Amino acid sequence: MAVSRITRWRLMSMFFGIKCLFLIVALGVLVKNSFTIQNIQSTPSSTPIVEFQKVSKCCACLEKWIGHQCSCYFISKEEKSWKGSREFCASQNSSLLQLQTRNELSFMSSSQAFFWIGIHYNEERSAWLWEDGTFPSKDLFPEFSKFRQDHCIGYSISREISSESCENKNRFICKQLPT
C-alpha cells in the first residue's frame, strides 16, 4: 500500500510539473510577442501616417492634412495655376476648397495668403459655380458680377474673395470629405 501511494504522488507531481512547464513556455511566448508589437509600433514607417485629429473625432487625415469638422484640408506651400491646383487636388482624391459655412471661413483666418478655391465661371449655365456644380452661398459671398468671367476665384482673409487670371500661380487648399 505504501508503494502505491508513492507512485500516485509521483504521477501527480510529474503531471503538475509538466503543466507548470507548459505555462512557463506560454508566458515566454506572450512576453516575446508583446515586445515585438512594441518594436513595430515605435519603428518609423515610409508609408503615410494616418493621424486622428484632436479637433474632430469623426475623421482621420493623412500626414500633412489638417482635420476640421469631419473634413481634411491640405494647405499647399507651393504655387500653381488654378487648373494645376485643381489637378493636384484631384490626384489626392479631393477637390479645391468649397467653403460652405462661416465656421470654415474662420478656420481659414489663420493665414493671410491668397489661395485658389473651387469656384469657376460656367459658361453653359452663365454662372459662378463650385466644382461640384452647386451655386456659392449668397450668405458667404457677395455678388460675383464684379469679377471677370475669364478669371478664377481665390480667397484670403484680407481680401476675402477676389478674382485673378487663372494662369497666375497661387497657393491652394484641397478639401477631402471623409470616406
Swiss-Prot record:
<keyword id="KW-0472">Membrane</keyword>
<keyword id="KW-0675">Receptor</keyword>
<dbReference type="GO" id="GO:0043235">
    <property type="term" value="C:receptor complex"/>
</dbReference>
<comment type="function">
    <text>KLRD1-KLRC1 acts as an immune inhibitory receptor. Key inhibitory receptor on natural killer (NK) cells that regulates their activation and effector functions. Dominantly counteracts T cell receptor signaling on a subset of memory/effector CD8-positive T cells as part of an antigen-driven response to avoid autoimmunity. On intraepithelial CD8-positive gamma-delta regulatory T cells triggers TGFB1 secretion, which in turn limits the cytotoxic programming of intraepithelial CD8-positive alpha-beta T cells, distinguishing harmless from pathogenic antigens.</text>
</comment>
<feature type="topological domain" description="Extracellular">
    <location>
        <begin position="32"/>
        <end position="179"/>
    </location>
</feature>
<dbReference type="InterPro" id="IPR050919">
    <property type="entry name" value="NKG2/CD94_NK_receptors"/>
</dbReference>
<dbReference type="InterPro" id="IPR016187">
    <property type="entry name" value="CTDL_fold"/>
</dbReference>
<keyword id="KW-1064">Adaptive immunity</keyword>
<keyword id="KW-0735">Signal-anchor</keyword>
<dbReference type="GO" id="GO:0002228">
    <property type="term" value="P:natural killer cell mediated immunity"/>
</dbReference>
<dbReference type="GO" id="GO:0045953">
    <property type="term" value="P:negative regulation of natural killer cell mediated cytotoxicity"/>
</dbReference>
<keyword id="KW-1015">Disulfide bond</keyword>
<keyword id="KW-1133">Transmembrane helix</keyword>
<dbReference type="GO" id="GO:1990405">
    <property type="term" value="F:protein antigen binding"/>
</dbReference>
<dbReference type="InterPro" id="IPR001304">
    <property type="entry name" value="C-type_lectin-like"/>
</dbReference>
<keyword id="KW-0399">Innate immunity</keyword>
<dbReference type="GO" id="GO:0002250">
    <property type="term" value="P:adaptive immune response"/>
</dbReference>
<dbReference type="GO" id="GO:0045954">
    <property type="term" value="P:positive regulation of natural killer cell mediated cytotoxicity"/>
</dbReference>
<dbReference type="GO" id="GO:0005886">
    <property type="term" value="C:plasma membrane"/>
</dbReference>
<dbReference type="GO" id="GO:0030246">
    <property type="term" value="F:carbohydrate binding"/>
</dbReference>
<dbReference type="GO" id="GO:0023024">
    <property type="term" value="F:MHC class I protein complex binding"/>
</dbReference>
<feature type="disulfide bond">
    <location>
        <begin position="152"/>
        <end position="166"/>
    </location>
</feature>
<comment type="function">
    <text>Immune receptor involved in self-nonself discrimination. In complex with KLRC1 or KLRC2 on cytotoxic and regulatory lymphocyte subsets, recognizes non-classical major histocompatibility (MHC) class Ib molecule MHC-E loaded with self-peptides derived from the signal sequence of classical MHC class Ia and non-classical MHC class Ib molecules. Enables cytotoxic cells to monitor the expression of MHC class I molecules in healthy cells and to tolerate self. Primarily functions as a ligand binding subunit as it lacks the capacity to signal.</text>
</comment>
<dbReference type="GO" id="GO:0002223">
    <property type="term" value="P:stimulatory C-type lectin receptor signaling pathway"/>
</dbReference>
<keyword id="KW-0325">Glycoprotein</keyword>
<feature type="glycosylation site" description="N-linked (GlcNAc...) asparagine">
    <location>
        <position position="93"/>
    </location>
</feature>
<dbReference type="Pfam" id="PF00059">
    <property type="entry name" value="Lectin_C"/>
</dbReference>
<keyword id="KW-0391">Immunity</keyword>
<feature type="domain" description="C-type lectin">
    <location>
        <begin position="68"/>
        <end position="175"/>
    </location>
</feature>
<dbReference type="InterPro" id="IPR016186">
    <property type="entry name" value="C-type_lectin-like/link_sf"/>
</dbReference>
<feature type="disulfide bond">
    <location>
        <begin position="89"/>
        <end position="174"/>
    </location>
</feature>
<dbReference type="GO" id="GO:0009897">
    <property type="term" value="C:external side of plasma membrane"/>
</dbReference>
<feature type="transmembrane region" description="Helical; Signal-anchor for type II membrane protein">
    <location>
        <begin position="11"/>
        <end position="31"/>
    </location>
</feature>
<dbReference type="GO" id="GO:0023030">
    <property type="term" value="F:MHC class Ib protein binding, via antigen binding groove"/>
</dbReference>
<feature type="topological domain" description="Cytoplasmic">
    <location>
        <begin position="1"/>
        <end position="10"/>
    </location>
</feature>
<keyword id="KW-0430">Lectin</keyword>
<feature type="disulfide bond">
    <location>
        <begin position="61"/>
        <end position="72"/>
    </location>
</feature>
<keyword id="KW-0812">Transmembrane</keyword>
<comment type="subunit">
    <text>Can form disulfide-bonded heterodimer with NKG2 family members KLRC1 and KLRC2. KLRD1-KLRC1 heterodimer interacts with peptide-bound MHC-E-B2M heterotrimeric complex. KLRD1 plays a prominent role in directly interacting with MHC-E. KLRD1-KLRC1 interacts with much higher affinity with peptide-bound MHC-E-B2M than KLRD1-KLRC2. Interacts with the adapter protein TYROBP/DAP12; this interaction is required for cell surface expression and cell activation.</text>
</comment>
<dbReference type="GO" id="GO:0001915">
    <property type="term" value="P:negative regulation of T cell mediated cytotoxicity"/>
</dbReference>
<keyword id="KW-1003">Cell membrane</keyword>
<protein>
    <recommendedName>
        <fullName>Natural killer cells antigen CD94</fullName>
    </recommendedName>
</protein>
